[in-house]
Structures are given as structure tokens and as C-alpha cells.
């Protein structure tokens, strides 16, 4: 229920702006995390906009980000979200939950994920639990 409420909040806040949900916000919106409190919605923008309650990450072009429309908002794809989380190396709980939930949703497999070579060591760090069976 909390995720649906948060997603509705994001739609109300961002539906009229040019932006892409990013990082922890994208992971929450896509259901990769188990939810949590976020003081600001993280979004990619091509120019800074006056949107209260957001952390805006400026990028040159939306074309450099793999995204899709999802329930009325542009959001990074699942694969792009996981890559971004690993690159950012931010909240370990968000990264671990995102990988664990992805793994379960995909038949206990990471086979479809495309992790760049430079992130494979970090990916292994956060996914070692799968070998502890």
C-alpha cells in the first residue's frame, strides 16, 4: 500500500515536468525496493526546474539514459536503475533489496541483467548472498 501511495505522490508531483525518475526513486517506483522514506525524489533533468521536493541530476540529453514510460512517468529501466545504483554506490540497503527482489522476480537469476565490466566487482559484492545456500 505504501508503494502505491508513494507512486501516486510522484505522479502528482512530476507528471507535468520533463524528467526521468532516477536512482532510489526509480527503484522504489519500479517495485525493486521494499519501500522507504525519501526526503526528495531523485530525477534526471536536462535543465534545472523549480520542483519542490526533488533532487535534480542534470544530464545533457535524455537519450543517454535507458528509460521507459511506466504508469504515466518516465523512469529508468530496471537494468538502467540497477546500473545507476551500482555506479552511485549509495544506500546499501536499496542496492541489496533491488538486487534481491530482481533475483526473485526473475526466477532466481541475474541472467538478463547487463552489468558493465567496470561494475562487476561491486555487483558481486552486493549479490554474494546468492551463493550462501
State where each predicted segment sits.
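Hydrophobic alpha-helical interaction segments
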Residues: 39, 59-133
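Short gly/ser-rich loop at a beta-strand->alpha-helix junction or flexible surface loop bordering the NTP-binding
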Residues: 1-71, 105-108
